[in-house]
């Protein structure tokens, strides 16, 4: 087998998902290689999807680098899924996690913009709230965190971010550090009406009680 120094360094991106008990959903992850202009997909690699050491499924990444495994949650709550690359001669990548948020559809859902939660900088900042340049992310506004904590007691929350999908893990870590309520994080594509398209998709999936925060 090739040594780790000879293998490509890949990046796993796993996506949060909303679900209801007893209904199948797809667990989705991408295996990518960062490029100068855009990430390139790594196809033909085995990805393992696990929960607390139990195998949920495994499958090959397609030509687009994406792998999907069907999963049916049984009870309301949060399921943390770990995704990792199987033994490979070509690729090495750090494992990552995503959440399956199993909810009751009767409860309202409120969309929260991650960017709106960031404290205003003392000087102009032309970058995104969570740049990949290594700059330290700003903290959240303390009052916003308190308000979200109260809101989360009577509604489900979903976070949307304009950050690139490659930054999802960093965004989740940032949310944890700032003690935001644990909720799914969805990246928006850098295209016009991206949030509207996501809303349409969620409503087609049966999430009809979503509104903006």
Show the residue positions of the predicted features.
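Glycine-centered loop-to-beta-strand initiation motif
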Residues: 60-73, 77
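Beta-strand-rich structural segments
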Residues: 19-39, 47, 83
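Asp-based phosphoryl-transfer active-site loop
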Residues: 108-125
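Beta-strand-rich domain onsets/edges
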Residues: 1-26, 100-104
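Edge beta-strands of extracellular beta-sandwich domains
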Residues: 90-101
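Short amphipathic beta-strand segments in non-cytosolic proteins
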Residues: 46-57
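C-terminal cap/substrate-recognition subdomain and adjoining C-terminal extension
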Residues: 129, 133, 141, 158, ...
């Amino acid at each position: 087998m090739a040594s780790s120094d000879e293998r490509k360094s890949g990046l796993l991106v796993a996506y949060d998902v909303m679900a209801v008990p007893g209904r199948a959903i797809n667990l989705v992850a991408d295996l990518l290689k960062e490029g100068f202009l855009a990430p390139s997909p790594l196809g033909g690699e085995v990805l393992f999807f696990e929960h607390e050491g139990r195998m949920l499924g495994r499958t090959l990444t397609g030509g687009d680098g994406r792998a999907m495994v069907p999963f049916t949650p049984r009870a309301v709550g949060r399921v943390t899924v770990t995704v990792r690359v199987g033994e490979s001669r070509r690729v090495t990548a750090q494992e990552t996690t995503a959440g399956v948020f199993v909810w009751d559809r009767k409860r309202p859902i409120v969309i929260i913009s991650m960017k709106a939660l960031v404290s205003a900088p003392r000087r102009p900042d032309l970058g995104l709230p969570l740049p990949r340049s290594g700059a330290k992310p700003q903290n959240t506004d303390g009052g916003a965190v308190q308000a979200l904590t109260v809101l989360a007691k009577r509604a489900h929350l979903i976070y949307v971010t304009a950050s690139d999908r490659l930054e999802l893990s960093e965004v989740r870590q940032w949310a944890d550090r700032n003690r935001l309520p644990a909720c799914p994080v969805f990246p928006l594509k850098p295209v016009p009406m991206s949030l509207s398209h996501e809303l349409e998709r969620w409503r087609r999936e049966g999430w009809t009680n979503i509104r903006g925060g």
